[in-house]
């Protein structure tokens, strides 16, 4: 996919699928993320090596769709749509009475560059992604690891797009409540 998006303040960005050659700019993006952002978004190691030797190396075989929002020079947003089995999500949702099939109900995780958060970029990106997914077999998007209860920006983003809060769970490592949210299409 390749979509031009205009931020509310008029700047043009492109939302597109990640490709092998993106390892450099993706690694720079990961390494630029602040501790605050890392504390809310930690799906995998966020460094250059991981971008190059794991993500971009396995791009065609890892069963994950990844999308980036880019300016002419840098990555400012990153979306993961992962079709692999997530046993923790599977059992939590099962406890809510929902049986996930990750081929149809992939897990979803977004991250926007610190300098661009709260400016409408994730909203524009998610809107374009959901339209792109119209032609796909995707039945729902399941938030990877839920979202931290105090992360109001994320929760508001998800609510705005129709994600529903399904349940809550506590994690020891950050001593926080997390909210499971899912968007059924
Ligand atoms: C969460 C995140 C992906 C949202 O992306 P974003 O581009 O900053 O979000 P948007 O600017 O599109 O805002 C989405 C909605 O959040 C709400 N919002 C915006 N700023 C807010 C703020 N400071 N506090 C609370 N809610 C806010 C608004 O409802 C907004 O929609 P609206 O402007 O149409 O009303 C991004 O901030 C981010 O990467 N944060 C750090 C990592 C993270 O939390 N990832 C998600 C883990 S679950």
Model-inferred region functions:
Residues 104, 133-147:
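Conserved GNAT acetyl-CoA-binding A-motif
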């Amino acid at each position: 996919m390749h979509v031009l998006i205009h931020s509310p303040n008029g700047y043009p960005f492109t939302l597109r699928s990640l490709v092998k050659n993106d390892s450099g700019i993706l690694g720079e993006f990961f390494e630029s993320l602040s501790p605050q952002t890392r504390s809310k978004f930690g799906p995998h190691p966020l460094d250059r090596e991981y971008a190059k030797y794991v993500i971009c190396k396995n791009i065609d075989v890892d069963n994950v769709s990844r999308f980036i929002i880019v300016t002419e020079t840098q990555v400012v947003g990153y979306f993961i749509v992962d079709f692999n089995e997530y046993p923790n999500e599977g059992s939590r949702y099962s406890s809510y009475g929902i049986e996930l099939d990750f081929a149809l109900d992939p897990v979803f995780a977004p991250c926007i560059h610190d300098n661009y958060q709260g400016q409408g970029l994730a909203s524009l990106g998610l809107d374009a992604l959901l339209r792109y997914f119209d032609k796909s077999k995707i039945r729902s998007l399941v938030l990877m690891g839920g979202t931290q209860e105090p992360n109001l920006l994320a929760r508001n983003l998800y609510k705005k797009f129709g994600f529903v809060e399904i349940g809550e769970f506590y994690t020891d490592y950050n001593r926080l409540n997390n909210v499971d949210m899912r968007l059924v299409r």
